Amino acid sequence: MTIDDRKIKILQAIINDYIHTGDPVGSRTIAKKYNLGVGSATIRNEMADLEDMGYLEQPHASSGRVPSNKGYRLYVDSLMENQLLTPEENLKIKQYIIDTAMLEVDKIVRQTSSLLSELTNLTCVIQTPSVNKSFIKSLQLMKVDSTTLVSVIITDAGVMKNHIIRVNSTPTIEELNKINAVINRRLVNLCIEQINLQVINQLKEDLQGYDELFNALLTPLYETLKNAADSPDLIMEGATNIFNYPEYNDIEKAKEMLSLLNDKESLRDLLKTNKDITIRIGEENYKPQAKDCSIIAAEYSFGDRPIGTIGLIGPKRIDYSKVISIMAEIVKELNNILNNQSK
């Protein structure tokens, strides 16, 4: 059996209605609310065919139909229409651009997560920038007092790492300028993951005569490398939003969702994407705790290099068209903000 134009229009109407009401949809509802040019008896027969084809499900014998995972997938891939942002949504995004223009990267990411959660009424999870793929833009030693220095490591993505260094006696300002020049000549434009024992030994040769300072400098370098090897952190906003949907009045579904939101490793796996926007529905999420939800994920980038991922988590009946429009616009602006900061 093939899915013809009439079945497609009926399926589209059912999914749109279910997304906005959360109630199983009957043939009379479609006949009354949508001008499809056919009566409820014809719609009922077509709905039975759509169920046989796997696009609809009937949760209870006496109820209407709801979309299946297969139905949602067809809807997302082929049937949903682009939705423009409202003036209020555009205004909030413009304010976000202004508010984050001069912030550090971690604060920008946190505000991004908060805005996405607010505008979509979903749970937002953002993977913070991955340091190991970043390049060192600057490493500066600055004198605090006669026995204390602070090292400031800045990556090309704007991530800053500060470390206090204790020595018996700090170099003079003139010596410090020379040392900074040597360090930056050796390390600037190196990817964090390229800093290996060979590079460290070369730096040691460059800093002959400053053995105490070199040994002290190893600590912040080691910490930076260790942080790079660690899994990127996750920022979550709107964790309770998802429980406003009646689907999660079911205690078992609520437990599964709580389990997922507390499982950082699973969340990192589910956020993986190599596309502008990835949509996974139900069992496409390949994690048992996520089988009843949808996850929309997108990369954000510094230049052409992806540095993190944004994910929105909600029930399968989320308003895909609206959410995708909001996600695409905010990711675009986030990329612009990060790239403008580097100039």
Swiss-Prot record:
InterPro entries named in the record: GAF-like_dom_sf, HrcA, HrcA_C, WH-like_DNA-bd_sf, WH_DNA-bd_sf, WHTH_transcript_rep_HrcA_IDD
Gene Ontology biological process terms from the UniProt entry: negative regulation of DNA-templated transcription
Protein's recorded name: Heat-inducible transcription repressor HrcA
Family the UniProt entry places it in: Belongs to the HrcA family.
GO MF terms, alphabetically ordered: DNA binding
A Pfam entry, by short name: HrcA
Superkingdom in the source lineage: Bacteria
Organism: Clostridium botulinum (strain Alaska E43 / Type E3)
Stored HAMAP family: HrcA
Keywords from the named record: Repressor, Stress response, Transcription, Transcription regulation
Role of this protein: Negative regulator of class I heat shock genes (grpE-dnaK-dnaJ and groELS operons). Prevents heat-shock induction of these operons.
